[in-house]
Amino acid sequence: MREIKGFINGEFVGSGGFGEIYSPATGELVCQYHKTSIEQVGEAVDAARIALKGPWAGYSIQDRVDILYKIADGINARFDEFLEAECLDTGKPYSLASHIDIPRGAANFKIFADTIKNVGDEAFHMPTPDGTGALNYTVHKPKGVIGVIGPWNLPLLLMTWKIAPALACGNTVIVKPSEETQLTSTLLGEVMNEAGVPKGVYNVILGIGREVGEALITNPGLDAITFTGSTATGERIAAAASVGVRDSSLELGGKNAGIVFADCDMDKAIEGTLRSAFANCGQVCLGTERVYVERPIFDEFVQRLKEGAEALKLGRPEDPETNMGPLISKSHREKVLSYYQAAVDEGATVVTGGGIPDMPEDLAGGYWIEPTIWTGLPETAKVVQEEIFGPCTHITPFDTEAEAIELANDTPYGLASSVWTENVTRAHRVAAQMETGICWVNSWFLRDLRTPFGGAKQSGTGREGGHYSLEFYSELTNICVKL
């Protein structure tokens, strides 16, 4: 059984208390972690502050670029270790993590290394009454000590998506991973040391959110907080960040819709919807939990999606044929099952799934659940309105384009949407009316990482990606020089 410690000021530190991590695939105890104490949270913030004003402050942009490339190379050099840790933590298939989580976790550092190299400062000449003029120019400076609170669904990918731009801009970070998935954040500490990152630049605290997470977000030593997770937790973090007028970047929940028109490429629409509904066992903030299908193809679409869902193979993470893993925890499965029951109670037609699958004896203790499809519910139904974060989706027919747009936008969330049609003019027209941070056309989970990512409405504040991330992690000073 593994044992992990927090990472503070370049060293792994123990504590007096322990927490436990269980394998989502088997339910077995696989790791003990040292719970970071409240005092150690303060020490991490202090270490980050000292590093910010100390050696890290002397690094040029090119120095930081070189460091980021070394971190990326370090992750790739230990690819198998990160892969094993990520899949042990989450239960997700190796086939998924090896193609998405670990490569993107490394690539994020190179992406933002390249981005920071190409960010220019503005300069303007202005006239003055005496005719000599003045020069105005901007200077980018680090924002300071950043609290990074990560989710459990894509632990390494989404953590490095925040850490990489923060370090690129010269900040220091204290990372609080989810208590469910802490292995890769601590393993990254080893890579940071190997890459020559100064002590205190990267710190990791371990424990549950209401204890160490709360201690972190309320610490006055933080200059900004970035968070990915539920809307409810995001609201709490926003409130904490407002004390002291600190910045916060929040990527929150979604109740994402797909619109499928009768002229779509059916094969592509089915494949894309299957991925968006069931990838990572539905534990993706960008997942599609609502699908609106034009009536002439409704029955065919439902039948083909059913066949696709029933063909998914649940199994051990390391099995190359496994393409859907378990839910993250027993408590999360209970939550998702409560939604499955609510759908039935409200009169849903269960097209497929709706329960716990029969698994081999060695996996019977895991947190497995069936991929589920419903039809027949009104828009007011609980499973149509609330984010479930499980492998399930509800399909509704529509008759007109205007109706589909209205239905898709009828939610307090605004993270993502997708449109499936071969009519390019309609695709652009409908996509422009989606009240979401991103809208895919004939695709899903595809994005140039230089573009902005984030949610509208209750799905978050701020944008991440490319120079949009750098704006959050930088302070700008305008310098005006009289000539």
Protein language model features and the residues they cover:
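Residue-level signal for inorganic ion chemistry
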Residues: 27, 64, 86, 170, ...
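Short, well-ordered beta-strand elements within core beta-sheets of diverse protein domains
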Residues: 29-36, 53-57, 147-148, 258-261, ...
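Rossmann-like NAD(P) dinucleotide-binding subdomain of oxidoreductase/dehydrogenase enzymes
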Residues: 121-268, 398
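A short hydrophobic/small-residue beta-strand
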Residues: 172-174, 350, 438
